Amino acid sequence: MHKVQLIIKLLLQLGIIIVITYIGTEIQKIFHLPLAGSIVGLFLFYLLLQFKIVPLTWVEDGANFLLKTMVFFFIPSVVGIMDVASEITLNYILFFAVIIIGTCIVALSSGYIAEKMSVKHKHRKGVDAYE
């Protein structure tokens, strides 16, 4: 029964994140902002966390789950690129090198930022971050 509670908690936390992202998308549509709706949602999410309107405990496990499974979210992008590969007139080796390097940069920078935030968060709680 304990696993069921953890799954429900995770789904609720993911739901909160998805709703905030959806609200960001709607804000972008209404105000015709030159940013992607998901970026507006991310900024909104950041503000809600900063001003403690949404406590970190409400979304922490869901966010950690998304960070752990982030690599799977890049796969549809690569498959989509493969569908239009015949329309790409660039040097294929250069094109795929840029994709691989860009993906590595995003993954490494995301991991670095997440690690720094985790250490900072644990430091605030008074826990040794390297236990």
Swiss-Prot record:
InterPro entries according to UniProt: Holin-like_CidA, LrgA/CidA
Membrane topology, from the record:
Multi-pass membrane protein
Keywords attached to this entry: Cell membrane, Cytolysis, Membrane, Transmembrane, Transmembrane helix
Q: Which GO terms describe its cellular component?
A: plasma membrane
Give me the segments passing through the membrane: 7-25, 30-49, 62-82, 92-114
The Gene Ontology biological process terms listed for this entry are: cytolysis; killing of cells of another organism; programmed cell death
**Cell membrane among keywords:** yes
Pfam families per the record? LrgA
Q: Does the keyword Transmembrane helix apply?
A: yes
Compartment list: Cell membrane
Task: State the disulfide connectivity.
Answer: none
- Family per UniProt? Belongs to the CidA/LrgA family. CidA subfamily.
Function recorded in the entry? Increases the activity of extracellular murein hydrolases possibly by mediating their export via hole formation. Inhibited by the antiholin-like proteins LrgAB. In an unstressed cell, the LrgAB products probably inhibit the function of the CidAB proteins. When a cell is stressed by the addition of antibiotics or by other factors in the environment, the CidAB proteins possibly oligomerize within the bacterial cell membrane, creating lesions that disrupt the proton motive force, which in turn results in loss of cell viability.
PANTHER family attached to this UniProt entry: HOLIN-LIKE PROTEIN CIDA (PTHR33931:SF2), HOLIN-LIKE PROTEIN CIDA-RELATED (PTHR33931)
Q: What is this protein called?
A: Holin-like protein CidA
Tell me which species this is from.
Staphylococcus aureus (strain N315)
For this protein's source organism, the top of the classification is:
Bacteria, Bacillati, Bacillota, Bacilli, Bacillales
